[in-house]
Protein backbone atom coordinates (compact mmCIF):
# COMPACT_ATOMS: atom_id res chain seq x y z
CA UNK A 1 0.00 0.00 0.00
CA UNK A 2 1.00 3.60 -0.47
CA UNK A 3 1.10 4.34 3.28
CA UNK A 4 3.33 1.37 4.13
CA UNK A 5 7.02 1.33 4.94
CA UNK A 6 9.03 -1.53 3.47
CA UNK A 7 12.57 -2.31 4.57
CA UNK A 8 14.82 -4.86 2.87
CA UNK A 9 18.22 -5.78 4.21
CA UNK A 10 21.08 -8.09 3.30
CA UNK A 11 23.83 -8.77 5.81
CA UNK A 12 27.08 -10.64 5.23
CA UNK A 13 28.29 -12.03 8.54
CA UNK A 14 31.11 -14.08 10.06
CA UNK A 15 34.77 -14.45 8.98
CA UNK A 16 35.48 -14.76 5.24
CA UNK A 17 36.09 -18.51 5.41
CA UNK A 18 32.58 -19.20 6.74
CA UNK A 19 30.74 -16.01 5.77
CA UNK A 20 27.02 -16.16 5.26
CA UNK A 21 24.66 -13.72 3.55
CA UNK A 22 21.31 -13.38 5.25
CA UNK A 23 18.49 -11.32 3.81
CA UNK A 24 15.11 -10.30 5.08
CA UNK A 25 12.42 -7.72 4.80
CA UNK A 26 9.58 -6.22 6.76
CA UNK A 27 6.55 -4.12 5.94
CA UNK A 28 4.93 -1.75 8.40
CA UNK A 29 1.32 -0.79 7.70
CA UNK A 30 -0.85 1.72 9.56
CA UNK A 31 -3.59 -0.14 11.48
CA UNK A 32 -6.15 2.68 11.40
CA UNK A 33 -6.54 6.45 10.99
CA UNK A 34 -4.86 7.05 14.36
CA UNK A 35 -1.57 5.70 12.96
CA UNK A 36 0.21 8.67 11.41
CA UNK A 37 3.57 9.29 9.80
CA UNK A 38 6.29 11.60 11.10
CA UNK A 39 9.32 12.79 9.13
CA UNK A 40 11.92 15.34 10.08
CA UNK A 41 15.55 16.22 9.43
CA UNK A 42 16.65 16.58 13.05
CA UNK A 43 19.76 18.34 14.33
CA UNK A 44 20.86 16.20 17.29
CA UNK A 45 23.17 18.13 19.62
CA UNK A 46 25.53 17.11 22.43
CA UNK A 47 22.69 17.56 24.96
CA UNK A 48 20.17 14.76 25.56
CA UNK A 49 16.78 15.70 24.16
CA UNK A 50 13.58 14.25 22.70
CA UNK A 51 14.22 12.65 19.31
CA UNK A 52 10.67 13.25 18.06
CA UNK A 53 8.85 16.58 18.37
CA UNK A 54 6.55 18.70 16.27
CA UNK A 55 3.67 17.54 14.10
CA UNK A 56 2.52 14.56 12.07
CA UNK A 57 2.63 14.64 8.27
CA UNK A 58 -0.67 15.41 6.58
CA UNK A 59 -0.77 12.52 4.14
CA UNK A 60 -4.55 12.64 3.82
CA UNK A 61 -6.41 15.57 2.30
CA UNK A 62 -6.98 18.59 4.55
CA UNK A 63 -8.13 22.08 3.73
CA UNK A 64 -5.82 25.08 3.74
CA UNK A 65 -6.98 26.25 7.19
CA UNK A 66 -6.24 22.97 8.99
CA UNK A 67 -3.09 22.99 11.10
CA UNK A 68 -1.01 19.81 11.27
CA UNK A 69 -1.78 17.57 14.24
CA UNK A 70 0.74 18.00 17.05
CA UNK A 71 2.59 15.00 18.44
CA UNK A 72 2.39 14.45 22.21
CA UNK A 73 4.80 12.64 24.49
CA UNK A 74 2.15 9.97 25.19
CA UNK A 75 1.80 8.96 21.51
CA UNK A 76 3.15 5.44 20.83
CA UNK A 77 5.96 4.92 18.34
CA UNK A 78 5.11 1.76 16.42
CA UNK A 79 8.04 1.95 13.98
CA UNK A 80 11.17 4.11 13.98
CA UNK A 81 13.77 4.68 11.26
CA UNK A 82 16.88 6.81 11.85
CA UNK A 83 19.50 7.69 9.22
CA UNK A 84 22.57 9.54 10.47
CA UNK A 85 23.58 11.78 7.55
CA UNK A 86 26.62 13.18 9.35
CA UNK A 87 30.07 12.02 8.27
CA UNK A 88 31.95 12.49 11.56
CA UNK A 89 29.66 12.20 14.59
CA UNK A 90 27.40 9.43 15.81
CA UNK A 91 24.33 9.46 18.00
CA UNK A 92 23.15 7.47 21.02
CA UNK A 93 19.42 6.76 21.33
CA UNK A 94 17.75 5.53 24.51
CA UNK A 95 14.20 4.19 24.68
CA UNK A 96 13.38 4.11 28.40
CA UNK A 97 12.83 7.80 29.12
CA UNK A 98 16.28 8.24 30.64
CA UNK A 99 18.98 10.67 29.67
CA UNK A 100 20.83 9.66 26.51
CA UNK A 101 24.58 9.44 27.09
CA UNK A 102 27.65 7.82 25.55
CA UNK A 103 28.09 5.53 28.58
CA UNK A 104 24.47 4.33 28.77
CA UNK A 105 24.46 0.52 28.76
CA UNK A 106 21.10 0.12 26.99
CA UNK A 107 21.46 2.79 24.30
CA UNK A 108 21.73 2.16 20.57
CA UNK A 109 24.69 3.80 18.80
CA UNK A 110 24.19 4.93 15.20
CA UNK A 111 27.50 5.86 13.63
CA UNK A 112 28.18 8.38 10.87
CA UNK A 113 26.39 7.50 7.62
CA UNK A 114 24.64 4.56 9.30
CA UNK A 115 20.95 3.68 9.67
CA UNK A 116 18.90 1.91 12.34
CA UNK A 117 15.27 0.81 12.41
CA UNK A 118 12.94 -1.15 14.65
CA UNK A 119 9.42 -1.76 15.87
CA UNK A 120 8.76 -0.27 19.30
CA UNK A 121 5.13 -1.15 20.09
CA UNK A 122 5.13 -0.01 23.74
CA UNK A 123 7.49 2.96 23.55
CA UNK A 124 6.09 6.47 23.75
CA UNK A 125 7.45 9.57 22.06
CA UNK A 126 8.46 10.87 25.51
CA UNK A 127 10.62 7.78 26.12
CA UNK A 128 12.94 8.28 23.14
CA UNK A 129 15.92 10.57 23.73
CA UNK A 130 19.07 11.14 21.69
CA UNK A 131 22.46 12.79 21.98
CA UNK A 132 25.28 13.27 19.48
CA UNK A 133 28.46 11.53 20.49
CA UNK A 134 31.48 9.64 19.32
CA UNK A 135 31.54 5.98 20.24
CA UNK A 136 33.08 5.74 23.69
CA UNK A 137 33.25 9.44 24.52
CA UNK A 138 31.14 12.56 24.63
CA UNK A 139 30.36 14.26 21.36
CA UNK A 140 31.27 17.80 20.46
CA UNK A 141 29.22 18.44 17.35
CA UNK A 142 25.72 18.18 15.94
CA UNK A 143 24.67 15.04 14.08
CA UNK A 144 22.00 15.47 11.42
CA UNK A 145 19.42 12.68 11.41
CA UNK A 146 16.59 11.73 9.11
CA UNK A 147 13.90 10.52 11.51
CA UNK A 148 10.83 8.74 10.15
CA UNK A 149 8.25 7.07 12.36
CA UNK A 150 4.81 5.51 12.31
CA UNK A 151 3.13 6.79 15.46
CA UNK A 152 -0.18 5.90 17.09
CA UNK A 153 -1.87 9.24 17.88
CA UNK A 154 -3.41 8.31 21.24
CA UNK A 155 -4.49 11.84 22.19
Spans of model-derived segments:
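Hydrophobic beta-strand residues in large extracellular and virion-surface proteins
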Residues: 82, 91-93, 128-130, 145-147
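C-terminal interaction-tip segments
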Residues: 3-19, 132-155
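Asparagine-centered strand-capping/turn motif at beta-strand->loop junctions
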Residues: 81-87, 130-137
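Intrinsic-disorder/low-complexity, polar/charged segments enriched in Ser/Thr/Lys/Arg/Asp/Glu/Gln
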Residues: 39, 77-79, 115-117
Amino acid sequence: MADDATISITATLLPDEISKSISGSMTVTPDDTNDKWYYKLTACTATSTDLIAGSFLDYTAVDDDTAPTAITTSDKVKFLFIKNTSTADGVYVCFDGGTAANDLVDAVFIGPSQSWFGRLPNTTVGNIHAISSDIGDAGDATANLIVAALIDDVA
